């Protein structure tokens, strides 16, 4: 993988967060993606979200697969743990890492090729097992590294840069995430940082499987007329169901809303998610209604963005498996294997 080190020099007056870190402390190496790639905007949003959340870089683990999207973890959080897996296998690696050490914050970064094709089964099982993570897909509808073939999320009827039409129906990763049990589901647009950063902050703070599908136009192969993943198309067909402000209880934040236009959602760590309702009838706590709404708007040619679903009582894999409080990778051999006498007691209890 191409690597360009970023100079460590920065202006001494850069703002610092509650831990004394600047944005530069959350950056990685210099991006080698195409100039104007939407993925770089997502990386910048992740940097902002972690800065605002006062996350200690060493407490976060970033994992990815293969593709343009999976290169991006090299461009943010250079002081964090990282693992670049094989194509489509990131969810399994993340699941294993989470089982071994639940004290880390897990961020999985993938793409529409990595998650919707070769890694589709991995993605679905990782979500249905309720792994505590934020899973982000950087969705551009094409295979950018191999010159722009349609991916599984490309809409039927969309046109490639070479002029060919896609005749296959698209996989909707948001719809799949809703069906298989994700407890936090959202969609955003790489060009809308005001919406994306609060969603990332909320997803990173969510105690369960959080999924965000980010439409991220490929400027090289899928940003032309006829593409449904281009900057122009998304801006023209973007229907946001809510506007968000994430409030970390460690810092006082004031936001002005007209009475009756917003609702507060308290997260399990005490943080507050304030939703400004742009569609009064939309309820992000109703999974079935969310799926119905998504289908109806898709049929109308609209792209729904914002917080689509939030389970007020999520459970993660460790709660379901009833694992011990301490991380499994800290247990000694004696604790893991108490000896033959303990085994004899277990066998006797089952007779």
Regions found by a protein language model. Name each.
Residues 117-118, 125-133, 138, 142-284:
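Glycine-rich ThDP/TPP pyrophosphate-binding loop and its adjacent helix/strand module
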